[in-house]
């Protein structure tokens, strides 16, 4: 009635029409079915395997005439990505050992192919976009590590070639017009963006990369140029660790030069020397322009200098020169001092500075009763912020008591921000022709000043508004560590008796002045000052707790002057029994504000309060 088949039985089907033999074997153990098709006419063997578990379909064809093995796989769960609709095909020619792969993106109809020839170590990649008929090809020569790419646009007959040399990190790009055989390195439009990066370290390597992009508003052609507009030099003296690097970009706004000097320890200089030095400068300049004639120029400069090891870097300084984008005036920044100590580490000055200039010119049109009124509007804003931190290392404090060890570390932080927002609105459009424009100066107290000349017949300025904000913050953080081998405590207690007291004092001064001038009316304020003390102690004593609170406030007011001062002191000491970590904290906060007013009355008020709570055992060692 029934016939039992083996698990690996092979079924053969012969098609007399095509003279092809089809063999199928099913292995239920692995849930895979293998189908083999032999065409005696072309002697081509086609083998297909279907894995029911992963729904994978793998087809392999072998042509004995050319010995070409082509394999394609389509896995609906992994290989076929419906999100990107990308098909990947790879073929290997064993005769020439050339690997060629092509991918088709069905969403954008972009066909790209790449081939690798191991004989010449050249990788060729070609992509065709049928939408725009743009053919782009790139080749990489592995022997010389030079990467070059080119794109051809048949519409404009323009060939764009870009090459990168990793050895010198030089990026060169030039568009070529075959019709006129003209090679253009720059665009007729001013530079829209520029990035300059300089990095150097102690092993004698220095890298300079620059990228400049130009946009032609007429043809909307984006052209980029690299080191063609850069004159750079960087050198490092390993013996003295002197790093000097300069860069000049004549077509852009910034000319920057940096020199870093640092002494090395006496003795022979070896590769295992712990003293390392690195200097990284990142300078970015960007300019944007729109049809409304709005221009924004911003630049940021970040200096990061680090030094580690046992070297005595007693001489360390940074000299920076910067060119103002508006006036092209060279300004030299002050030298940032560092700690001059004989300890195992040195001060690490960190400085950052950013400048933003913005100007907007336009004409506003208002219509009323079929009458159009044109009003020119000219406004500008400037913002400059800088921050400098000087970290001094732990400085041991000598003491005759062998049971006491103390160290002090100081951190100074300077933060400064200036902003200016002047604007002028004139009711007469003819006055715009006689204006001298805005003049920006990075060294003046107000980064942007107004210098305008109006004809006597058109002196009809309706409103002048100028607002300047100047904020400077100076923070000094002093950390003191005192280790005491205390003999105070329970004599029957055999635990640790070491006591560590850490005190952090933060002195913060934040004078922030804001002045607004509108129709010959001005206001100005403020000044803030605060001191914070944090004390922490670790000890192995009995339970000790205490709280100290002191409040003090005073306010005095007079004509054209207002002064308020507030001081708050809070001390809390907590020590638990048989504990290694016992924390005590304290804080002192004081603030002062000064305001200038037109009218006022005298008022003086002072409030003082002192509260002290202590447990049975006071802290005798504090």
Curated annotation (Swiss-Prot):
It comes from Saccharomyces cerevisiae (strain YJM789) (Baker's yeast). It comes from the Eukaryota. Induction: Induced by pheromone. Down-regulated by RIM101 and inositol. Residues 1-35, 47-200, 374-405 are annotated as: Disordered. Signal peptide: none annotated. Transmembrane segments: none annotated. Disulfide bonds: none annotated. Residues 14-35, 396-405 have a biased composition (Polar residues). The gene is PRM7. Residues 47-199, 379-389 have a biased composition (Low complexity). This is Pheromone-regulated protein PRM7.
């Amino acid at each position: 009635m029934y016939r039992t088949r083996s698990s690996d039985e092979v079924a053969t089907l012969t098609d007399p029409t095509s003279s092809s033999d089809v063999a199928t074997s099913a292995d239920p153990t692995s849930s895979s079915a293998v189908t083999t098709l032999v065409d005696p006419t072309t002697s081509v063997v086609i083998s297909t395997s279907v894995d029911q578990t992963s729904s994978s379909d793998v087809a392999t064809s072998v042509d004995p005439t050319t010995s070409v093995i082509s394999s394609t796989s389509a896995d609906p769960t992994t290989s076929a990505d419906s999100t990107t609709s990308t098909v990947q095909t790879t073929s290997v020619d064993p005769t020439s050992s050339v690997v060629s792969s092509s991918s088709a993106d069905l969403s954008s109809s972009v066909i790209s192919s790449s081939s690798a020839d191991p004989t010449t170590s050249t990788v060729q990649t070609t992509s065709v976009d049928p939408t725009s008929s743009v053919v782009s090809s790139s080749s990489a020569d592995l022997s010389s590590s030079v990467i070059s790419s080119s794109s051809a646009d048949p519409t404009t007959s323009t060939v764009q070639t870009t090459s990168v040399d990793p050895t010198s990190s030089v990026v060169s790009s030039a568009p070529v017009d075959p019709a006129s055989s003209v090679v253009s390195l720059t665009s007729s439009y001013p530079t829209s963006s520029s990035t300059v990066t300089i990095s150097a370290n102690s092993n004698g390597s220095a890298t300079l990369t620059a990228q400049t992009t130009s946009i032609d508003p007429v043809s909307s052609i984006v052209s980029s140029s690299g080191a063609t507009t850069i004159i750079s030099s960087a050198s490092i003296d390993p013996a003295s660790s002197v790093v000097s690097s300069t860069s000049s970009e004549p077509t852009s706004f910034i000319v920057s030069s940096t020199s870093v000097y640092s002494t090395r320890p006496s003795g022979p200089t070896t590769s295992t020397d712990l003293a390392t030095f690195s200097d990284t400068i990142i300078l970015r300049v960007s300019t944007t322009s729109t049809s409304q004639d709005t221009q924004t120029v911003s630049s940021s400069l970040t200096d990061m200098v680090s030094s580690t090891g046992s070297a005595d870097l007693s001489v360390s300084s940074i000299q920076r020169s910067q060119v103002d984008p508006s006036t092209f005036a060279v300004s030299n920044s002050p030298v940032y001092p560092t700690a001059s100590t004989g300890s195992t580490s040195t001060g690490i000055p960190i400085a950052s500075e950013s400048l933003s200039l913005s100007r907007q010119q336009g004409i506003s049109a208002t219509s009323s009763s079929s009458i159009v009124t044109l009003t020119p509007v000219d406004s500008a804003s400037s913002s400059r912020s800088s921050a400098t931190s000087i970290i001094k290392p732990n400085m041991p404090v000598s003491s005759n008591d062998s049971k006491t060890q103390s160290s002090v570390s100081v951190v100074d932080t300077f933060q400064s921000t200036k902003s200016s927002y002047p604007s002028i609105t004139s009711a007469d459009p003819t006055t715009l022709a006689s204006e001298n424009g805005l003049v920006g100066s990075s060294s003046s107290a107000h980064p942007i000043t107004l210098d305008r000349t109006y004809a006597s017949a058109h002196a009809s300025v309706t409103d002048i508004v100028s607002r300047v904000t100047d904020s400077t913050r100076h923070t000094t953080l002093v950390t003191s560590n005192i280790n005491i081998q205390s003999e105070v405590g329970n004599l029957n207690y055999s635990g640790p008796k070491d006591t560590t007291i850490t005190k952090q004092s933060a002195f913060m001064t934040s004078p922030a002045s804001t002045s607004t001038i509108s129709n010959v009316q001005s206001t100005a304020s403020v000044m803030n000052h605060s001191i914070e003390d944090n004390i922490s102690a670790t000890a192995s004593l009995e339970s000790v707790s205490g709280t100290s609170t002191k409040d003090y406030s005073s306010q005095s007011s007079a004509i054209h002057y207002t002064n308020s001062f507030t001081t708050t002191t809070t001390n809390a000491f907590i020590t638990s029994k048989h504990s290694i970590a016992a924390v005590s904290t304290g804080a002192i906060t004081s603030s002062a504000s000064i305001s200038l007013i037109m009218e006022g009355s005298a008022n003086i008020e002072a409030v003082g309060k002192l509260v002290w709570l202590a447990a049975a055992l006071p802290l005798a060692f504090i």
